[in-house]
């Protein structure tokens, strides 16, 4: 009798945990960013680039003063750039490409889920003293941004600009 009740109860609990884990597995960026950060799709600011076709490397240093160096980067339309995001600070930082609107929306999402991990070719989270890399092809002219979206960093002004000519 005990087994007839215990076994279905355990199966229900196991199914609940599996469903919760499955639902959480895709939360890397949440629904607000699914279209803006599709892995191989064009975005308003370009698309993931092929590392073998990178025309240059731009090193961007992230600091605990909540700044990027350089703060403005100019690229040519069609250019594929390898960004090396170097964390010169003692705390974790991010380098996330986007539009002003997408970065603001993502920053709000990050405040709700600060431990969110990025599964996005236009974003990299970098531990203190480490470096990360993004390869991006800028397909459209315009002015775009990069930012650190860890809660408090974006709000403190950790935003840079990419000008595509």
Swiss-Prot record:
PROSITE patterns assigned: MULTICOPPER_OXIDASE1
Result of knocking out the encoding gene: When exposed to copper, the deletion mutant shows reduced growth under both aerobic and anaerobic photosynthetic conditions. Mutant is extremely sensitive to copper under anaerobic photosynthetic conditions. Mutants lacking this gene are more susceptible to copper than the Cu(+) ATPase copA mutant under microaerobic and anaerobic photosynthetic conditions. Periplasmic copper accumulation in the deletion mutant affects periplasmic and membrane c-type cytochromes.
UniProt: Cu(2+) binding residues: 93, 148, 153, 158
Phenotype upon changing residue 39 to S: Does not affect activity
Region named Disordered: 25-50
Gene3D superfamilies given in the database record: Cupredoxins - blue copper proteins
Phenotype when changing residue 113 to S: Loss of activity, cannot restore copper tolerance in a deletion mutant
Keyword Hydrolase (UniProt): no
Induction (UniProt): Induced by increasing copper concentrations under microaerobic respiration and anaerobic photosynthetic conditions. Not detected under aerobiosis even at high copper concentrations. Full induction requires the presence of the transcriptional regulator CopR.
GO molecular function, one term: electron transfer activity
Pfam families: Copper-bind
Cleaved signal peptide residues: 1-23
InterPro entries reported in the protein's UniProt record: BlueCu_1, Cu-binding_ET, Cu_oxidase_CS, Cupredoxin
Subcellular location: Periplasm
GO cellular-component term (any): periplasmic space
Result when mutating residue 118 to S: Loss of activity, cannot restore copper tolerance in a deletion mutant
Comment, domains: Is a green cupredoxin able to bind a maximum of three Cu(2+) ions: a green copper site (CuT1.5), a type 2 copper binding site (T2) located in the N-terminal region, and a third site with a yet unidentified location.
Family of this protein: Belongs to the CopI family.
Subunit field text: Monomer.
Protein name listed in UniProt: Copper-resistant cuproprotein CopI
Record organism: Rubrivivax gelatinosus
Lineage start: Bacteria, Pseudomonadati, Pseudomonadota, Betaproteobacteria, Burkholderiales
């Amino acid at each position: 009798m005990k087994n007839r009740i215990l076994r279905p109860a355990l199966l229900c609990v196991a199914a609940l945990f599996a469903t919760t884990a499955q639902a959480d597995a895709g939360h890397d960026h949440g629904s607000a960013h699914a279209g803006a950060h599709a892995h191989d799709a064009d975005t308003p600011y370009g698309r993931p680039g092929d590392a073998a076709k990178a025309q240059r490397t731009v090193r961007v240093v992230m600091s605990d003063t909540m700044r990027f160096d350089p703060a403005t980067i100019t690229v040519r339309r069609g250019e594929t750039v390898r960004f090396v995001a170097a964390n010169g600070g003692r705390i974790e930082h991010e380098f996330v490409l986007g539009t002003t609107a997408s970065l603001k929306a993502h920053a709000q999402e990050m405040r709700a889920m600060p431990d969110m991990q990025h599964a996005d070719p236009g974003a990299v989270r970098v531990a203190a003293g480490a470096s990360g890399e993004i390869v991006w092809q800028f397909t459209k002219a315009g002015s775009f941004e990069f930012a650190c979206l860890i809660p408090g960093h974006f709000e403190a002004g950790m935003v840079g600009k990419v000008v595509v000519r």
